[in-house]
Amino acid sequence: MAAYEAIANRPGAYRVVLEERAEGVYVNVFADTSSNAPYIDILQSDLAMAKRACRQDYGIEEHQWRRIADVDWHAPEPRE
């Protein structure tokens, strides 16, 4: 799956990472530059909806997104 990152640089939302998964796209919000994990994660139905929500909520424009290595905050649990 793919992941995308943008710097919002707003109070309480320094960075946003979109994480594509089978169930949809997680919008992971990081509070500041020292945050190691998101403090908010909102599930959107698809990438377009996630980007629209980020534009509305955090002012992130399409050109600000960059593809990054896949992240695993919501990776499926390994099967035993």
List each language-model region with its residue ranges.
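Short amphipathic beta-strand/extended segments with alternating polar/hydrophobic composition
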Residues: 17-18, 37-47, 77-78
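A short, charged, amphipathic alpha-helix used as a generic interaction element across diverse proteins
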Residues: 39-61
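Intrinsically disordered, low-complexity boundary segments flanking structured domains
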Residues: 2-5, 28-29, 51-52
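A generic structural signal for short, solvent-exposed coil/turn residues
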Residues: 8-10, 19, 57-59
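Negatively charged, low-complexity tracts enriched in Asp/Glu with abundant Ser/Thr
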Residues: 1-11, 64-77
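Short aromatic-glycine-(Arg/Gly/Cys) micro-motifs in beta-strand/loop hairpins
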Residues: 12-38
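Surface loops and adjacent helix of pleckstrin homology
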Residues: 30, 55, 63, 70
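A short linear-motif detector with a strong N-terminal bias
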Residues: 5-8, 21-22, 43-46
